[in-house]
Swiss-Prot record:
CDD domains: SUMT. The active site is at D248, K270. Residues 216-448 are annotated as: Uroporphyrinogen-III C-methyltransferase. HAMAP family: Siroheme_synth. Then it catalyzes the NAD-dependent ring dehydrogenation of precorrin-2 to yield sirohydrochlorin. Finally, it catalyzes the ferrochelation of sirohydrochlorin to yield siroheme. Pfam families: CysG_dimeriser, NAD_binding_7, Sirohm_synth_M, TP_methylase. Its EC number is 2.1.1.107, 1.3.1.76, 4.99.1.4. This is Siroheme synthase.
Length: 457
């Protein structure tokens, strides 16, 4: 280990930055956030330093570097574009046994600045020892995505509860299980973020008073249309906290690779007209796992509330008194159209968009007359097997046969295929495609040749 990671208490302690440019400004922000009593020395300063000085946040010393500025300092940073001056600052600090950071010169410094994830009071520092700052930054960005933004507020609140929790729970094991519940409770985190005192109190009392082996909870998470990069930040956090993940075939392998390694995985894949696991059985799986006290994620392709039967699953949980929440996802219509260069709305061509299921419950019938109207975009989910019927019905109700159409297969994935044509060709085009596919009908499809960015990558 080349460096010892430490966290310094700098509040109301003298610190010095030598340099008045953009790099020095970034370092100054960190020291000011830490509460340091800051002096900045340079021949000239960018406007931000002047603004800080006018606000009484720091002291500016304009002119050449004077070693006496270090006499009362706890810590110094050399952040000029003059290597010789930076070296001089470092040597003067070393002689006084003051830790000094030299920007972009780790060998000349007695300490280095890590990449920081600030969820105060929780702090995470990432460093490559100065050998690869870009790698440290990339790792920090990945860690940022794993730590909820409100985690710091939850940590502060936990500090206020420590005394009560110690009284309530007799053993270390009980206290540990309580804290684990508290830190993954979304309602508490959101209530703290909103400063909703009533909800904070209610949630806290519920967490403290319910048995530690209480029923679990279910989170419906939309996995998006295929590309793992389209999974939301909150969705990622949820699947990495899950004890059980119940997923279907529309969830890509790339997304499943993000699931916590020790989580149980239950595949309930479904296809139009064929259910690997009946919907009622899926409902019971969610209920059964939650009643075991587990944190269950129901992971669905697209958005769980858009043709995902999420509402049906939640009704079962609601009737059984199981807590649940929903994390929306990017629905297939949005993802597939964007990755195909087809805007769903356009001032010249479509003032509305309709999302339509391609198969209905027995006896269901669509309002084809309204669907055949101009100035709108139609998006059919699970409509591949009904493409010929869709073509026939729309033409019968007045939609022009030359209306542009497109079918998107495996939308947003690297295996995405798009085929386009006219409404009179829809049934024939569908025979060339496989599920999962999405059908888009409307004048906006005509923009695809111009706006198709994804295939060019």
């Amino acid at each position: 280990m080349d460096h010892l990671p430490i966290f310094c208490q700098l509040r109301d302690r003298d610190c010095l930055i030598v340099g008045g440019g953009d790099v020095a400004e970034r370092k100054a922000r960190l020291l000011l956030d830490a509460g340091a009593r800051l002096t900045v020395n340079a021949l000239a300063f960018i406007p931000q330093f002047t603004a800080w000085a006018d606000a009484g946040m720091l002291t500016l010393v304009e002119g050449p570097f004077d070693e006496s500025l270090l006499d009362t300092c706890w810590l110094a940073i050399a952040a000029t574009d003059d290597d010789a001056l930076n070296q001089r600052v470092s040597e003067a600090a070393e002689a006084r046994r003051i830790f000094c950071n030299v920007v972009d010169a780790p060998k000349a410094a007695s300490f280095i600045m890590p990449s920081i994830i600030d969820r105060s009071p929780l702090m995470v520092a990432v460093s490559s020892g100065g050998t690869s700052p870009v790698l440290a930054r990339l790792l920090r960005e990945k860690l940022e995505s794993l730590l909820p933004l409100h985690l710091g507020q939850v940590a502060k609140y936990a500090g206020q509860l420590r005394g009560r929790v110690k009284q309530q729970f007799a053993t270390m094991g009980e206290r540990r299980r309580f804290w684990e519940k508290l830190f993954v409770n979304d309602r508490l985190a959101q209530s703290l973020a909103n400063n909703d005192q009533k909800a904070i109190t209610e949630t806290t009392e519920q967490l403290i008073n319910e048995p530690l082996d209480h029923r679990g909870e279910v989170v419906l998470v939309g996995a998006g249309p295929g590309d793992a990069g389209l999974l939301t930040l909150k969705g990622l956090q949820q699947i990495q906290q899950a004890d059980v993940v119940v997923y279907d075939r529309l969830v890509s392998d790339d997304i499943m690779n993000l699931v916590r390694r020790d989580a149980d995985r239950v595949f309930v894949g479904k296809r139009a007209g064929y259910h690997c696991v009946p919907q009622e059985e899926i409902n019971q799986i969610l209920l059964r796992e939650a009643q075991k006290g587990k944190r269950v994620v129901r992971l669905k392709g697209g958005d769980p509330f858009i043709f995902g039967r999420g509402g049906e699953e939640l009704e079962t949980l609601c009737n059984a008194g199981i807590p649940f929440s929903v994390v929306p996802g990017i629905t297939a219509a949005s993802g597939c159209s964007a990755y195909s260069g087809i805007p769903l709305t356009h001032r010249d061509y479509a003032q509305s968009v309709r999302l339509i299921t391609g198969h209905l419950k027995t006896g269901g019938e669509l309002d084809w007359e309204n669907l055949a109207a101009e100035k709108q975009t139609l998006v059919f989910y699970m409509g591949l097997n009904q493409a010929a019927t869709i073509q026939q019905k729309l033409i019968e109700h007045g939609m022009p046969g030359e209306m542009p159409v497109a079918i998107v297969e495996n939308g947003t994935a690297v295996t995405q295929r798009v085929i386009d044509g006219t409404l009179t060709q829809l049934g024939e085009l569908a025979q060339q495609m496989n599920s999962p596919s999405l059908i888009i009908i409307g004048r906006v499809v005509g923009l695809r040749d111009k706006l198709n960015w994804f295939s060019n990558h």
